[in-house]
Regions:
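Short glycine-/acidic-enriched loop or helix-start segments at secondary-structure transitions
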Residues: 10, 86-91, 134, 150
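Small-aliphatic-rich amphipathic alpha-helix that forms the alpha element of a beta-alpha
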Residues: 69, 100-126
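Basic phosphate/pyrophosphate-binding loop/patch that engages nucleotide-derived ligands
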Residues: 72
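Short, Asp-centered acidic motifs that coordinate Mg2+ and/or phosphate
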Residues: 76-77
């Protein structure tokens, strides 16, 4: 069964929360060059947030949490992809502005972030491999306190799947 779930406004609240969280990193302007440009940018952007923006983001997160829990309540578990894209090569984010790098990473892994914001339990299970031998995984999202159910369903998926082949690189 498909869940009738539409996370409107999620991207905006996530950006506020992520920047606000980064603002707490004890990083001086002089030391900004010692960290990744993305980290320095997030810290700087987070420190620019107003109290009103932060409170708005926190209120939106609470509303998102309540709405997501309510929308998923009819299900013992909700199945999502683990990632929105295939594995990216090392260095694929290099050469982009910090803002673009952040957007690319959000687009790459949107499913785990919404689960974290909603405070729901989740487990990721590799279900197959791609042509290069990279694992392809799904994520099971459960109800609040539903960890035992998730582990039971994950064990059933793993048993049905059988052993995964090891990556070709292991033979090199």
């Amino acid at each position: 069964t498909d869940a009738d779930w539409h996370p409107s406004g999620y991207a905006e609240l996530f950006h506020v929360l992520w920047r606000a969280s980064a603002a707490r990193i004890p990083l001086s302007d002089a030391d900004a060059e010692l960290v990744e440009p993305l980290t320095a940018w997030l810290v700087q952007e987070g420190r620019r947030l107003s109290a009103l923006e932060l409170l708005g983001g926190l209120a939106a997160a609470r509303a998102f949490e309540r709405r997501t829990i309510a929308d998923f309540s009819a299900f013992d578990a909700v199945l999502t992809p683990a990632l929105a894209q295939p594995p990216q090569p090392i260095g694929s984010y290099a050469g982009h502005s910090p803002e673009r790098t952040f957007a690319m990473q959000v687009e790459y892994a949107p499913y785990s972030s919404f689960v974290n914001v909603a405070g729901l339990p989740a487990v990721t299970i590799p279900v197959t491999t791609d042509a290069e031998g990279h694992p392809v995984s799904v994520q099971l999202v459960g109800r609040p306190g539903g960890e035992a159910t998730l582990l039971e369903v994950a064990a059933q998926l793993e048993a049905r799947r059988g052993p995964l082949p090891h990556p070709p690189a292991w033979d090199a």
